[in-house]
Every structure is written in structure tokens, then in C-alpha cells.
Amino acid sequence: AETAAAAVGDVDLSDKKVGISIYQFNDNFMTLYREELVRYLTEDLGFAAENVVVQDGKGDQAEQTNQIQNFITQQYDVLILNLVQASSAPDVTDMCHAAGIPVVYINREPDVAEEERWAAEGIAATYVGCDARQSGTYQGEEILETATKGDINGDGVVSSRANRRMLTLSTEPSSLLRLLPTRAWKLKSF
């Protein structure tokens, strides 16, 4: 957070418009993510709250694509997208690129070929997220470090309750940094 804020420096972002579309609001992790994202954009980077618009994709790619088209029509300065379907990234990227609007994909990574296309064609698009396999491995290591090693009832099997506890821990903002260490995050800039 400090690095991005430092990179922005003295630039006034208060009149810049940020369009955010989350694949679905009833996902607990993405609820915390979007709340923290809005807080970060407004409090740390200086975007005006009224210029940061977050919409619910409702688990429907057509609905989300319509939201993205509306953001483009309304000339938003940047879009931050958690796609319903990562496979829609090429079409969405092309729409944003044609409008001259940078796009940041979060949490659901477009495929490697698409990311390579951005670099090859000079497209202002990037992905910010974590390596899910590495995060899962790290969470498993955390369970193994507990006194019961996740076997709460002593039956020799990692209890589902331990898994729920890890999920709860992993979605609390204060524990995200511990459960998703810096080395797990990818940041590809444009």
C-alpha cells in the first residue's frame, strides 16, 4: 500500500473515476476485498468516494459485461474487474483498450496467452492476485502448526471446522498478510 501511494505522489486523483465490478457480492472474501479496496482508493490514494463506483456482477457475465460497457460509455478513468468468467478477459480487454481505459483484473487471473498479448500489443491491462495453489499450501502449513494439526475431534482426519476456521482467518483483513504472504502475490504492471 505504501509503495503504490508513494508512486502516486502528489498527483490529485480526486476527480478521477474508478469503475469496479465484482463477480458477485455475496462472496464473503470478495465483500471484504471490495470494502478494503474502496477504503484504500479513497483514504490512501485520494480518489473521491463519489467517483469510486462498485457494482455487483451477480454471477452473470452478461450482466457484468453490460456494467463494463456502461463504465466505458461514462468515460471512467480506470476499471478494476473481478470477472465472473476469466475466459471473457480478451473481449473485455479489447473493449477497454479501444476506449483508452486501463484495466486491472483482480483475483481471477486471465490465461497466460492473454497476459502475454497485453505485453506484446502494449495494452494497458494488468492482473493483481495470488497463486491459489501456493496460498492453499500455505494454509495447510498453518493448520499443521496448530496443536491438533487440524484434527479437532481426534479422529485422524483434518476437521471441517479447522478448514472453516482457516477460511475465516484468511478472509479477515488483518490476517490476509499472514496467510497470503508477499511472495504469493503477483503484480504485473502496465
Which role fits each region the language model picked out?
Residues 1-190:
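A residue-level marker of the well-folded mature domains of exported/periplasmic proteins
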